[in-house]
A protein has these predicted regions:
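A short glycine-rich beta-strand->turn/loop micro-motif centered on a GG-aromatic cluster
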Residues: 102-105, 124-138
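Catalytic phosphate/metal-binding cores of nucleic-acid and nucleotide-processing enzymes, i.e., regions
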Residues: 2-3, 85, 100, 108, ...
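Gly/Ser/Thr-rich loops at beta-strand to alpha-helix junctions
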Residues: 23, 107-111
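Active-site alpha/beta core segments
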Residues: 3-100
Length: 160
């Protein structure tokens, strides 16, 4: 759904950004007994097929590709760096004159929420397209939706 939406609406955006976990040694983020809130089973391990973008997302040829969580837990795309330039997302968005963000993807309760909250904190107008994201659980999704709404994130369906 995400790749189809972005492909259909790419001309509406000045910049397309992808982000992905790229864990090298994320410390206590990985656990043999994860709580699925702060600790997780191994995932997004750098250099593995599982860490790669889905082929449909990779085919979008994003303007900025963010890797995050190399050496610690990092839910927000603002915590990572662009693969090509090694620059942080905030700097790259500012340099492009971007002032608003539409955030989609997985998981609404974690990475989407933290990226949206950081975007608002950094002065962007932020929307999350509710039909293009899913939480880890309904309960965590409700909590994330409340946090985002309270912070000024607009939660809306996409136009498709």
């Amino acid at each position: 759904r995400v790749a189809d939406f972005v492909a259909a609406h790419a001309a509406d955006y000045d910049c397309i950004v992808t982000s992905q976990d790229w864990h090298i040694d994320p410390g206590s983020h990985f656990s043999d007994h994860p709580d699925f809130v702060d600790t997780w089973p191994p995932h997004g391990v750098a250099g593995t097929v599982e860490a790669e973008l889905h082929p449909a997302l990779a085919a979008l040829h994003a303007d900025i590709t963010i890797h995050k969580g190399m050496y610690e837990a990092a839910y927000s795309a603002f915590d990572g760096e662009d693969v090509a330039t090694k620059r942080p997302l905030l700097e790259l968005l500012r340099n492009k004159g971007i002032d608003s963000l539409d955030v989609v993807g997985l998981a609404q309760s974690h990475c989407v929420c933290e990226t949206a909250l950081d975007g608002v904190k950094d002065g962007f107008k932020v929307r999350v397209f509710t039909d293009l994201t899913e939480p880890v659980s309904p309960e965590l999704g409700e909590l994330a939706a409340h946090r985002m709404t309270e912070a000024g994130v607009e939660l809306v369906p996409s136009k498709d």
